[in-house]
Amino acid sequence: MTAIILDGRALAKTLREELRADTQAFIQNNGIAPSLAVVKIAGDPASDRYTRTIRKGCEEIGITFTDHTLPPETTQAMLEETISALSFDRTIHGILLHLPLPPGLDSARAIAQIDPAKDVDGVHPYNAGLLAMGRPGLIPNTPAGGMELLLRNNIPLKGQHATVVGRSVVVGKPMALLLLNEHATVTIAHSRTKDLAAVVRSADIVVAATGKPGLITGDMVKPGAVVVDFGVNVLEDGRVVGDVDFDSVVNVASAITPVPGGTGPVTNVMLLRNVLRAAQQQLASRHH
């Protein structure tokens, strides 16, 4: 049996069309466009590439994009001042701080300056707390994208055993909580887990978020399981692979996200959806 491929590019296209329609409706109703401010420190080519992708996405959908690139010698105080000013600026609905920051800058203190209502990356402790309590807040985009792939493909989650391999604050932990909120039985595994293969093999849904290429192999996966791969690993030969050994798992699983073209494309649309949601909530709270 060969797994169904959970195609992130196709889903991202559908989501973008839905989001464009929702954004245009917002603009017509409110007379303004949702707006995103990206804050980053100059000098990181990967950060520049990511920013270009976000800018293009905003333009396609109708979101106003502003780029706040700070010089390499930026101090903690300057960074916090920039974020704080954007938090107070009523014309800005979403703030995205590009992480990781260069050495010498404290990301936790910088993130604390983001108004939680504008935290479109879902990284502020306030939004993490809402997620842990099962209350709606702004959700981190990577796990939100993975959930969207599962839900839109009608993958049953209720009562299913999901093993999340990886406990990062940005992907593993929030993904485990999102699955829990959908009534899955969730196990979190990580680098210290004893007999990882056995823990993974017991799962109906396997989520890989470790940053270790090819960690999850076909012999670790229960036949018919659904596999979500958040890994983005660039090999020495330039190939991009996930945390799942696709070639061996594709013959065992019932459904699998490819890398590239799986969770990645959906993640970027989730960011833009958060910008619209943040704008909607901010305008609604002003009207009360």
Curated annotation (Swiss-Prot):
GO terms for molecular function: methenyltetrahydrofolate cyclohydrolase activity; methylenetetrahydrofolate dehydrogenase (NADP+) activity. It comes from the Bacteria. Its EC number is 1.5.1.5, 3.5.4.9. Keywords: Amino-acid biosynthesis, Histidine biosynthesis, Hydrolase, Methionine biosynthesis, Multifunctional enzyme, NADP, One-carbon metabolism, Oxidoreductase, Purine biosynthesis. NADP(+) binds at residues 166-168, 191, 232. Pathway: One-carbon metabolism; tetrahydrofolate interconversion. InterPro entries: Aminoacid_DH-like_N_sf (IPR046346), NAD(P)-bd_dom_sf (IPR036291), THF_DH/CycHdrlase (IPR000672), THF_DH/CycHdrlase_cat_dom (IPR020630), THF_DH/CycHdrlase_NAD-bd_dom (IPR020631). It catalyses: (6R)-5,10-methylene-5,6,7,8-tetrahydrofolate + NADP(+) = (6R)-5,10-methenyltetrahydrofolate + NADPH; (6R)-5,10-methenyltetrahydrofolate + H2O = (6R)-10-formyltetrahydrofolate + H(+). The keyword Zinc-finger does not apply. One of its GO terms (cellular component) is cytosol. SUPFAM superfamilies: Aminoacid dehydrogenase-like, N-terminal domain (SSF53223), NAD(P)-binding Rossmann-fold domains (SSF51735). The keyword Hydrolase applies. One of its GO terms (biological process) is purine nucleotide biosynthetic process. Catalyzes the oxidation of 5,10-methylenetetrahydrofolate to 5,10-methenyltetrahydrofolate and then the hydrolysis of 5,10-methenyltetrahydrofolate to 10-formyltetrahydrofolate. Homodimer. Belongs to the tetrahydrofolate dehydrogenase/cyclohydrolase family. This is Bifunctional protein FolD. It comes from Roseiflexus sp. (strain RS-1). The gene is folD.
